[in-house]
Amino acid sequence: MDRVSLFHGYLPIEPADRMRRLKELEARVYSENQTQLFIETPYRNHKMLEDILKTCRPQTKLCIAANITCEGEFIQTKTVKEWKGKLPELNKIPCIFLIYK
């Protein structure tokens, strides 16, 4: 099966709704071989990252692409487990988050 990438824009702001949506997106990663892309308002990036790390499986891959095409560009992929405890500073910079297997 070919890999498909889907862009979802902003996820819900309410924590319970956001975590439920993250679980749905991660399920599609594994059941449909899809990469899920989404963004967050820059001042909420850290909260989004925390929620991803709390919600997603340890083996799920998370790519964080921040400040793309700008000075200080940051693009890195690790598993959820590898990201825990080693969070980049993402406050007030545009980011795209991708989850996949």
What is the role of each PLM region?
Residues M1-R28:
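Class I SAM-dependent methyltransferase SAM-binding "motif I" and its flanking Rossmann-like core
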Residues S31-K101:
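A contiguous loop/helix-start segment that scaffolds small-molecule binding in enzyme catalytic cores
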